[in-house]
Amino acid sequence: MTTARKASAVIIAGVVVGLVSGLALGVVWWRLAPRVPLVVQPGASFPQGYQPEGYLAADAAFGALAVIAGVAITIGLANMRREHLFSVLIAALLAGVIGTAAMWWVGTRLGSVDIQGLSATTTTDVVVDAPLKVAMPGMYVMWPIASALVVTILALGDWISEVRSARRGR
């Protein structure tokens, strides 16, 4: 197997694993994240009481799942192709972007309510669970950052190992 073929195999594996794990983690996020009660009135909707901790907890759950996935998947990809960390980095970053998008898409779609439609058709106040959302945009880059950090640590470890073996060889 050629070097380019091995690198492309790691990249394809990263994309596939990122997509599948992102879809699965979207379901996990949907089940773990707390919901904020939303009061829907004719023509308007607003949170029932101000509850920023609900949004913060949903974002924290999203970020924690993303970091765990980034570390685990990057370690798995590095085991596939440890001698060429650049392809591992590309695969891990692609897995992070695709996995984060899939996780967000599934988590926000499951259990969501058409708030505007409900508001237009209701005649009394209705309390529903607000759909999940990521309030802090920084959560979207947690998976790629965790992946890049793992590759950086692996590269640093390889470099330190090479420096030590070069010093012993003198």
Segments predicted by a language model, with ranges:
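Cytoplasmic membrane-interface segments at the C-terminal ends of transmembrane helices
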Residues: 2-11, 34, 72-92, 108-115, ...
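Hydrophobic alpha-helical membrane-insertion segments
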Residues: 14-29, 90-108
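Interfacial/capping segments of alpha-helical transmembrane domains
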Residues: 26-42
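Perimembrane loop-to-helix junctions flanking transmembrane segments
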Residues: 37-55, 120-124
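Membrane-helix interfacial "entry" motifs
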Residues: 2-14, 50-59, 80-84, 88, ...
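Hydrophobic alpha-helical transmembrane segments
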Residues: 11-16, 54-68, 89-94, 126-149
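Juxtamembrane non-transmembrane "cap" segments at the membrane-aqueous interface
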Residues: 99-123
